[in-house]
């Protein structure tokens, strides 16, 4: 397995649903890479998921990943809820279809390639890399509008 990667992810949405963006900060040793993008019609939760997917997809080899998100939806989904969803055919405990199942399945596939430790960080609390991921996600939204 390749080295240790530290990843910060964030999503943003102007309106929910509405135009949204995602941002990723990847750190490997002294190297830092940032990524961002957006979608015209989406939700905040979809952008939070997309940030994690795109960050993990960017890693070319299997890595030990310390992934930080300010989304309890993403962290709890992957660490607590997903095994039940998979067991229930992507249905919730209330027998309803899992929201964003397409992205949860993509995240599951990307996660399988790596050893990922999931961490929650309080958003907008001054952590530099979380703030940068937030800035990148908002840039993804702005660029949709040609700003």
UniProtKB/Swiss-Prot annotation:
Mg(2+) 2 binds at residues 10, 134. It is found in: Cytoplasm. Its cofactor is Mg(2+). Disulfide bonds: none annotated. GO terms for cellular component: cytoplasm. It holds the Pfam family RNase_H. PROSITE patterns: RNASE_H_1 (PS50879). Binds 1 Mg(2+) ion per subunit. May bind a second metal ion at a regulatory site, or after substrate binding. Mg(2+) 1 binds at residues 10, 48, 70. GO terms for biological process: DNA replication, removal of RNA primer. Signal peptide: none annotated. It catalyses: Endonucleolytic cleavage to 5'-phosphomonoester. It comes from the Bacteria. Keywords: Cytoplasm, Endonuclease, Hydrolase, Magnesium, Metal-binding, Nuclease. Its EC number is 3.1.26.4. Residues 1-142 form the RNase H type-1 domain. InterPro entries: RNase_H, RNaseH-like_sf, RNaseH_domain, RNaseH_sf, RNaseHI. GO terms for molecular function: magnesium ion binding; nucleic acid binding; RNA-DNA hybrid ribonuclease activity. Endonuclease that specifically degrades the RNA of RNA-DNA hybrids. HAMAP family: RNase_H. PANTHER family: RIBONUCLEASE H1. Monomer. Belongs to the RNase H family. This is Ribonuclease H. The lineage of its organism: Bacteria, Pseudomonadati, Pseudomonadota, Gammaproteobacteria, Pseudomonadales. The gene is rnhA.
């Amino acid at each position: 397995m390749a080295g240790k990667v530290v990843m910060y992810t964030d999503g943003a949405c102007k309106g929910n649903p509405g135009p949204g963006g995602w941002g990723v900060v990847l750190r490997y040793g002294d190297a830092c890479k940032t990524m961002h993008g957006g979608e015209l019609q989406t939700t905040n939760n979809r952008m939070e998921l997309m940030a994690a997917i795109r960050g993990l997809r960017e890693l070319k080899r299997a890595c030990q990943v310390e992934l930080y998100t300010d989304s309890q939806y993403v962290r709890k989904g992957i660490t607590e809820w997903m095994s039940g969803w998979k067991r229930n055919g992507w249905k919730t405990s209330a027998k309803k279809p899992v929201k964003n199942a397409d992205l949860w399945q993509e995240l599951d596939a990307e996660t399988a390639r790596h050893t990922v430790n999931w961490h929650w960080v309080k958003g907008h609390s001054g952590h530099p890399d979380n703030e940068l991921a937030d800035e990148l996600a908002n840039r993804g939204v702005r660029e949709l509008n040609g700003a």
